[in-house]
C-alpha cells in the first residue's frame, strides 16, 4: 500500500542485506517510524512487544528471524535455537508456527555454509506469497460486497453507502501487504463502490482506532471510529450491512480465534441477521485443531495494557496515562474464540466457503482428513456416534 505516495510493505530487507526493516506499529497513528532489525534477538523482541503484529505479518517476520539466526549460527543447533526462540514469542497466532516450520523444513537438507543465503531467499518468498494470498482474498471478498450493493440497490442509485463493521486491525499493517479483512474493502473502494466502515476502537491496545483508522484514512476510505460496545446498537438499527474480521487461528472445523471482543460482535450479528464473514489465508488454518474453545491457547498479556492508555496530550507530547485506581487488578486476555455456527462464511485466497470441516475441505482437499474405511473398527465407531447424534 502507499504511505505518503510511496509503495510500502510492512517488512522489507535492507538494501545491503543482513537486516530487515519494519514499521514500528506501537508508534502509530501519531508517528510513522521504521526500525531496523539486525539479529534474531531483535526480531523476537519486535514480535513479543508487538512492534509487528497480525498473524500473517508475525509469520513473515519470524521467517526473516530464522534467516538472521542462520547468519549468526547456521549449524543444526543454531537452526533449532532460532526456531525455539521465535516459537516462544507469542502462542496464539498459528502463522508463526507455520512460517517457522516452513523455514526449518526448507533448510534441513541445506549444508550449513549455504543456509544463510537459502534462508534469506525462503523468507522473501514467504513474504511475496503472503501478498498474493491477500490480494486474492480481496478479490473474493469484493464479490460479496458487490452482491450486497446489488441487494441494497446502491449500484442503481439506491440508498447508500454499504456499511461494514470491522474489529481490530486486519489490514495491510497486519500482513505484508493488502491485509485480510480490509483487502475487500480497499478493492471495493477502488472500484467506486460507496462503502463506509465502522471501526471498533478495539481495547485494550486500540488497534482499530490507532491502526485501522490510520490505514483507511491514508487510503481515503470513509470511516467512523466507534467505542467497542457500539456495534450491537448499530446492528439493531439497521446501520450495519456486513461484518468482516480477520483471524489469528482458524480450526479445521471453522472455529475462529481473533482479537478479544470478536465473539461478542458475532453474537450481535447473529441476533440481528447481519452477515458475519472472516477473512484468512490458508496458512492461518490450524489443521491439527478441531475445537477452538478447548484447544487454542489464549495469550494473556500485561495488565498495564488495560490500566493505561497511550496518546498525544494537548501540549503535543506522547504519553502513557493511567486510567484505573491504584491497586485495582486487571485481566488482559488477548483473544477469544467465535464458534463456526455464528460465522456466515470464510473468505480465503481460494474462494468463500462455509465455516465447517466440509467447507474448508472443499477448498483445501489436500488437507482434508483421509476417509475412514466403512468396514473398519474406527469407521463403525464413527457411524455409531453419528447415528446416536441423530
Curated annotation (Swiss-Prot):
Pathway the protein contributes to: Amino-acid biosynthesis; L-methionine biosynthesis via salvage pathway; L-methionine from S-methyl-5-thio-alpha-D-ribose 1-phosphate: step 1/6
Root EC class: isomerase
Pfam family, one: IF-2B
Source taxon at top rank: Bacteria
EC number(s) on file: 5.3.1.23
SUPFAM superfamilies named among the record's database cross-references: NagB/RpiA/CoA transferase-like (SSF100950)
Function according to Swiss-Prot or TrEMBL: Catalyzes the interconversion of methylthioribose-1-phosphate (MTR-1-P) into methylthioribulose-1-phosphate (MTRu-1-P). Also catalyzes the interconversion of 5-deoxyribose 1-phosphate and 5-deoxyribulose 1-phosphate. Part of a bifunctional DHAP-shunt salvage pathway for SAM by-products.
UniProt name for this protein: Methylthioribose-1-phosphate isomerase
Amino acid at each position: 500500500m502507499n504511505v505518503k505516495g510511496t509503495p510500502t510493505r510492512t517488512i522489507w530487507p535492507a538494501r545491503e542485506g543482513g537486516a530487515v526493516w519494519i514499521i514500528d506499529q506501537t508508534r502509530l497513528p501519531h508517528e510513522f517510524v521504521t526500525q531496523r532489525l539486525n539479529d534474531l534477538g531483535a526480531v523476537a523482541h519486535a514480535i513479543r512487544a508487538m512492534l509487528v503484529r497480525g498473524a500473517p505479518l508475525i509469520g513473515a517476520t519470524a521467517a526473516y528471524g530464522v534467516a538472521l539466526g542462520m547468519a549468526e549460527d547456521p549449524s543444526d543447533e543454531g537452526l533449532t535455537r532460532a526456531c525455539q526462540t521465535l516459537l516462544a514469542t507469542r502462542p496464539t497466532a498459528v502463522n508463526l508456527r507455520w512460517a517457522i516450520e516452513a523455514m526449518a523444513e526448507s533448510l534441513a537438507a541445506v549444508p550449513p555454509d549455504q543456509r544463510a543465503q537459502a534462508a534469506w531467499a525462503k523468507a522473501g518468498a514467504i513474504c511475496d506469497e503472503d501478498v498474493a494470498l491477500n490480494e486474492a482474498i480481496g478479490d473474493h471478498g469484493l464479490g460479496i460486497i458487490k452482491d450486497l450493493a446489488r441487494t441494497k440497490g446502491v449500484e442503481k442509485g439506491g440508498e447508500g453507502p454499504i456499511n461494514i463493521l470491522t474489529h481490530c486491525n486486519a489490514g495491510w499493517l497486519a500482513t505484508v501487504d493488502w491485509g485480510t479483512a480490509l483487502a475487500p474493502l480497499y478493492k471495493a473502494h477502488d472500484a467506486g463502490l460507496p462503502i463506509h466502515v465502522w471501526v471498533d476502537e478495539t481495547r485494550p491496545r486500540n488497534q482499530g482506532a490507532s491502526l485501522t483508522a490510520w490505514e483507511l484514512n491514508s487510503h481515503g476510505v470513509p470511516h467512523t471510529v466507534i467505542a467497542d460496545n457500539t456495534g450491537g446498537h448499530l446492528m439493531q438499527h439497521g446501520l450495519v450491512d456486513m461484518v468482516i474480521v480477520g483471524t489469528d487461528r482458524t480450526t479445521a472445523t471453522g472455529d475462529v480465534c481473533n482479537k478479544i471482543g470478536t465473539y461478542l460482535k458475532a453474537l450481535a450479528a447473529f441476533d440481528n441477521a447481519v452477515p458475519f464473514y472472516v477473512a484468512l489465508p490458508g496458512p492461518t488454518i490450524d489443521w491439527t485443531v478441531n475445537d477452538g474453545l478447548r484447544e487454542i491457547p489464549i495469550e494473556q498479556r500485561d495488565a498495564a495494557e488495560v490500566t493505561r492508555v497511550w496518546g498525544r496530550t494537548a501540549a503535543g507530547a506522547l504519553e502513557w496515562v493511567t486510567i484505573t485506581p491504584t491497586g485495582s487488578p486487571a485481566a488482559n486476555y488477548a483473544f477469544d474464540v467465535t464458534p463456526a455456527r455464528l460465522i456466515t462464511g470464510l473468505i480465503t485466497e481460494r474462494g468463500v466457503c462455509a465455516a465447517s470441516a466440509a467447507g474448508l475441505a472443499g477448498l483445501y482437499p489436500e488437507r482434508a482428513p483421509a476417509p475412514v474405511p466403512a468396514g473398519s473398527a474406527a469407521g463403525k465407531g464413527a457411524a455409531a456416534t453419528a447415528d446416536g447424534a441423530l
